[in-house]
Regions:
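Extended, amphipathic, non-transmembrane alpha-helical segments
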Residues: 54-62
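Hydrophobic side-chain positions on well-ordered alpha-helices
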Residues: 62-69
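Solenoid-repeat scaffolds in large eukaryotic assemblies
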Residues: 77-78
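Amphipathic alpha-helical coiled-coil segments
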Residues: 88-108
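A cross-kingdom feature marking charged/low-complexity
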Residues: 109-121
Length: 213
């Protein structure tokens, strides 16, 4: 029976993996801890969904204000609302990117079947969570604490899994994978933003231009 089986659900007697884990004051078998991490990530994802909806409502409000100001030739107010909307959309992109990146982490955690895969999966995942925590701090301060807990939980599992397998962590490779994952999430978020949100109006055609059209 593999070490992974012994350390996965802790239903069998202690094996080599269990003994090794004991040396490092193992706080519990891996599977329940991975499940806990998954649940915590999903909780944050639900909050991100709620944040996206609120940001979308605010986006619609500001966009309509810009249109009304442009129609009234009130460029000063139009510019004020446009600047606020631009900042709001940066926040929306960050929140959407975070949600997408966390979705990928959950998918990978749910497909882990071997102990060695835990290390390969969690190394970049932990780096992604750290980056997202920093990015969300200025957008959703209330999520920072939860992201810190998730980061700590994943780091603990990563260390314990690495101890059992004797796998040395390649932080450079993990960081590169994390950067790729974040870049992919950012690209998808940008695409979704373009699909869902109209361009910010700068001006409207005058009556002569409309008649010629």
């Amino acid at each position: 029976m593999s070490q992974f089986s012994n350390n996965w659900d802790n239903k069998k007697g202690p094996g080599l993996g269990d003994k090794l884990m004991g040396r490092f004051n193992n706080p519990g078998p891996l599977k329940p801890r991975l499940d806990q991490a998954t649940r915590q990530i999903q909780t944050v994802m639900a909050k991100l969904d709620t944040a996206v909806l609120k940001l979308r409502d605010r986006d619609t409000y500001l966009f309509n204000k810009i249109v009304a100001s442009v129609q009234k030739r009130d460029n000063q107010r139009a510019s004020m609302f446009a600047n606020e909307l631009a900042e709001l959309r940066k926040m929306s992109k960050m929140v959407t990117q975070s949600k997408l990146a966390l979705e990928q982490i959950v998918l990978r955690l749910n497909t882990v079947t071997e102990l060695g895969e835990v290390v390969l999966t969690l190394a970049p995942a932990t780096s992604v969570v750290r980056n997202l925590r920093e990015g969300l701090a200025g957008v959703m301060p209330e999520a920072e604490g939860e992201m810190s807990e998730i980061s700590g939980l994943l780091s603990g599992i990563l260390v314990d899994a690495g101890s059992v397998t004797g796998t040395s962590l390649n932080f450079e490779t993990a960081n590169e994978e994390a950067e790729r994952a974040l870049a992919e999430a950012a690209a998808v978020a940008e695409s979704r933003m373009k699909d869902k949100f109209p361009d910010i109006p700068q001006s409207i055609p005058d009556s002569n231009e409309m008649e010629m059209a």
